[in-house]
C-alpha cells in the first residue's frame, strides 16, 4: 500500500510539472487576414523543448508620421526562452524595455536570446529605433476558455468577424454576459456595454479598427481582461456613469488622435 501511495504521489507531481511547464502560441493568427510584419522572426519555447514560431503582426503607431511596428503574443505558465531575429539590418545595439525588468540577453549576430520567468509586456528595440520596435506580450495562462457559443457567452472564434447591418458597427452586450475573443479572433466592431451589469470581455483576440474599442456607459460590474485593440478611430475604452469597472492586461495600438486613451 505504501509503495502504491508513493507511485500515486509521483504521478501527481509529474502531472503537475507537465501542466505548469507550458507555453501557448496562437497559430490561428496566420489565417486571420491581419497584416504580417517581416522585420522580425520570433520563436518561443519551454527550455529544452522545440521552438514554436509566433505570428508577427503589423501594427501602426505614431500620429505625426504613421510607422509600422511589430507585435507578438503568447501565454506562459512556466519560464520560457525567446528568440528574436532582426531580418533587415545589422544589430549594433539592443534595448529591452522596461529597463527596470533587467532582462538579460545573449546576442549571436542579428539574433538575441533571453529567458522570461514570469508573464510581462516588453518592447524590444534594435539600434535605438523605438518606432519600428517589437512589442512582445507574454501573457499569463488563460484561466477560462470557451470553444463555442453557449448560454450567457458570446463567442468569437479564430478568424475575421464583420458584423453586418448593425447600427454604428457596434455589438450591444446585455447584462450577465461573457464575451470571449479566442486566440486568433479578429472582431471589426465596437463592443457596447450600455445600461448593463455583470459583463466580462475576455480572451486573447483582437478588436481591429473599431469606431471605439469598448464603450461602457451607465453600467456596473464590468471586466475587460486580456484582449488587444488595434487602431480604434476614437478611444480604446470610453465610458461614463459607470462603477466597478476592472481593466487588466489590455493592449492597445493607435496612430490617430485620442485613439489610445482609456477615458472613464
Q: Where do the PLM segments sit?
A:
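Sec-dependent signal peptide recognition
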Residues: 2-10
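N-terminal signal peptide c-region/cleavage motif recognized by signal peptidases
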Residues: 16-18
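Extracellular "leader-to-stem" segments immediately downstream of a signal peptide or signal-anchor
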Residues: 21-175, 186-188, 195-198
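Extracellular beta-strand-rich solenoid/capping regions of secreted or surface-exposed proteins
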Residues: 114-116, 161-178, 186-202, 208-223, ...
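Solenoidal tandem-repeat scaffolds enriched in leucines and small polar residues
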Residues: 244-245, 251-264
